[in-house]
């Protein structure tokens, strides 16, 4: 493990331990604290371990200097699934702690999160009723699973996100994200959101305008006069694609291995937290590339 990753994990542990302390459990305190648990989960995502058993074998062999106590797989899995609210709070806390948080420009997009392939796995999955069949136009393929709807800044810093049934309209999810946390938009006067053609809807435009938000997306050729800034969309849209590529190509989002609602949720959040942590730390140390994981992934 490199000294760069060692420094990042130490900074993350201190941040969580100082700012996100959870109420103490009844009885004997856990031997692995919540801050250590989240830090261990981030290290797993950055180093690319999909299998928790293999990850814990590696941790027992190489990370005892950072983590005096390391649990076995059942205890780690149980604690990690229960820590989903803490992981979400950590994502938000790190994002707020950067100078990118109040950026008046957001980019929104969705990407599939496959959860099963075989018909038998779909039939027996605990995700039935939450996951569903969907179609990914960019890859021209059907999948069974969920969709990750991510709202981020141009630098890739996650602002808010949601996992949803792939059959749910993207416009409904965006409206729900804004409606669920209206303060995110109200604290950014003149907020502009960039999106693709999937977000075209007069109803969505009216809803966002009521929250003081403007939406810029490509217009259809036969519908009205295009926005003067539309030629810039193609360049800016590549940013969100690169964010999705970071999550899938470097943090292995589609190899999450989750089989339950909590399991999928925390493993997706684990990867978003790892990316957020890298952005946060790179801004602190003045790294030339904000979203680079190269210094930490080996």
Task: Indicate residue ranges for each PLM-predicted region.
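Short alpha-helical elements
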Residues: 1-298
């Amino acid at each position: 493990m490199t000294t760069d990753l060692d420094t990042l994990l130490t900074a993350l542990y201190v941040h969580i331990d100082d700012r996100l302390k959870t109420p103490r459990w009844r009885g004997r305190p856990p031997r692995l604290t919540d801050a250590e648990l989240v830090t261990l989960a981030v290290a797993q995502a950055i180093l690319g371990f999909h299998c928790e058993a293999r990850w814990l074998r590696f941790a027992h062999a190489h990370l005892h200097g950072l983590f005096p106590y390391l649990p076995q797989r059942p205890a780690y899995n149980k604690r990690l699934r229960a820590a989903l609210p803490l992981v979400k709070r950590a994502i938000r806390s790190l994002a707020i702690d950067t100078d990118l948080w109040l950026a008046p420009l957001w980019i929104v997009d969705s990407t599939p999160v496959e959860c099963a392939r075989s018909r038998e796995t779909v039939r027996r999955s605990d995700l039935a009723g939450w996951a569903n069949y969907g179609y990914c136009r960019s890859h021209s393929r059907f999948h069974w699973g969920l969709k990750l709807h991510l709202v981020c800044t141009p630098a890739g810093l996650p602002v808010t996100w949601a996992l949803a049934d792939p059959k749910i309209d993207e416009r409904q999810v965006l409206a729900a994200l804004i409606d669920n946390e209206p303060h995110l938009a109200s604290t950014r006067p003149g907020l502009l959101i960039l999106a693709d053609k999937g977000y075209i809807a007069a109803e969505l435009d009216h809803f966002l305008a009521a929250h003081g938000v403007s939406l810029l997306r490509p217009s259809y050729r036969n519908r009205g006069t295009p926005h003067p800034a539309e030629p810039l969309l193609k360049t800016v849209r590549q940013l969100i694609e690169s964010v999705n590529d970071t999550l899938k190509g470097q943090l292995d989002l589609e190899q999450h291995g989750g089989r339950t609602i909590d399991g999928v949720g925390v493993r997706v959040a684990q990867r978003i937290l790892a990316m957020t942590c890298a952005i946060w730390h790179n801004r602190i140390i003045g790294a030339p590339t904000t979203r680079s994981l190269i210094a930490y992934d080996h």
